[in-house]
C-alpha cells in the first residue's frame, strides 16, 4: 500500500468513512449521520481521502454539489 494511502487511513473517522463506503456509494449527509461525526469533520476527511485516491466522487456529483456522493476507488 502506498505511503499516502496509509497516512490517509490512520484517523478513525477516515477508517469509518471507508468502512461505510465499502458496501455502497453514499452521500456526505449519510456519512455524517452514520459516522456520528460533525459535518465539517466528515467533509475534511472526505476531501483528504479523495486526494489520497482512496475514494472518489460518484459520477454526476462533485465538490460543488450540495450533498456530494462518494464511492471507494
Predicted features by range, described:
Residues 12, 23-27:
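Short capping segments at the starts of secondary-structure elements
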Residues 57, 72:
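Short beta-strand "wing" residues that participate in macromolecule-binding interfaces
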Residues 33, 50-51:
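Alpha-helical residues within the helix-turn-helix
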Residues 53, 59:
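Glycine-centered, phosphate/nucleic-acid-interacting loop/turn motifs that mediate DNA/RNA or nucleotide
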Amino acid at each position: 500500500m502506498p505511503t499516502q494511502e496509509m497516512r490517509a487511513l490512520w484517523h478513525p473517522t477516515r477508517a469509518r468513512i471507508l468502512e461505510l463506503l465499502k458496501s455502497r456509494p453514499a452521500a456526505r449527509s449519510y456519512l455524517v449521520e452514520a459516522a456520528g461525526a460533525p459535518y465539517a469533520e466528515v467533509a475534511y476527511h472526505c476531501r483528504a481521502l479523495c486526494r489520497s485516491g482512496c475514494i472518489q466522487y460518484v459520477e454526476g456529483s462533485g465538490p460543488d454539489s450540495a450533498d456530494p456522493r462518494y464511492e471507494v476507488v
